[in-house]
Amino acid sequence: MELQKLYSKVRQAVDAYQMIEDGDKIAIGISGGKDSLTLLYALAGMRKFYPKKYDVVAITVDTGVGNMDFSKVKELCESLNVPYEIIPTQIFPILMERQEKRMCPLCAKLRKGAFNEAALRLGCNKIAYAHHKDDVVETFLMSQVLEGRVHTFSPVTHLDGTELDLIRPLVYVTEAEVRGFTRRYQLPVVKNLCPVDGATKRETAKRMLARMEEEFPKAKSRIFAAIQRDHIDGW
């Protein structure tokens, strides 16, 4: 995917759901994966021409899984003129030591807490997650199969008990487009060393949708359109 196409799709989502206002300071959550680096590239570049003036910072919460090297991410941030902060934690070793049964949800909760705290400390009023179009559909499927309810995450959410709004500017971008952009612009993806990476319920949902598309081409796009048409969870 070309950079201009990325800008176009992100701007469409930002405008449709009024994600950015004048004076916003947005903290971008950087895991080092393809999605978060693509979001970083988009929001950093759009500062040059988007009519509403805003600023961004990048934050990585290092959970203490192995020896993950974010030096190339730091170089990318410097090239994009984006301040970058790494928050060191011992989240993963502590969870392993306690032998937590539901480690993934608890890890996510602790990471989000550390990220939100850093965002507020840096003077941010918004945070940005790199959930893309496929994530919306996968969450929709998982909610029905695992929870028995019709639900997915919203493009914009106010975080209760905080002064932060959460925005998801990549919701019009497919995972395939993110993957293509990452290759085309050689983004410095950091390998995820978490031992349960790729063995989650979301990966199962991803495979289910892939099989569905073999039988029903464009199934994901049509599910996404249904979510929007029925205004499910703020869409």
Give the positions of each predicted feature.
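Alpha-helical structural motif
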Residues: 2, 6, 69, 174, ...
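Residue-level detector of flexible, active-site-proximal loop/helix-junction positions
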Residues: 63-65, 91-93, 157-160, 173, ...
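A short, amphipathic alpha-helical segment
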Residues: 11, 15, 44, 210-213, ...
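Generic detection of long, well-ordered alpha-helical segments
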Residues: 33, 131, 213, 217-220
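A short, charged, Gly/Pro-tolerant segment at domain boundaries
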Residues: 200, 206, 218-235
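ATP-dependent adenylation/nucleotidyltransferase module used to activate substrates
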Residues: 1-139, 146-149, 176-184
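Catalytic subdomain that performs nucleotidyl-dependent activation
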Residues: 56, 126, 134-214
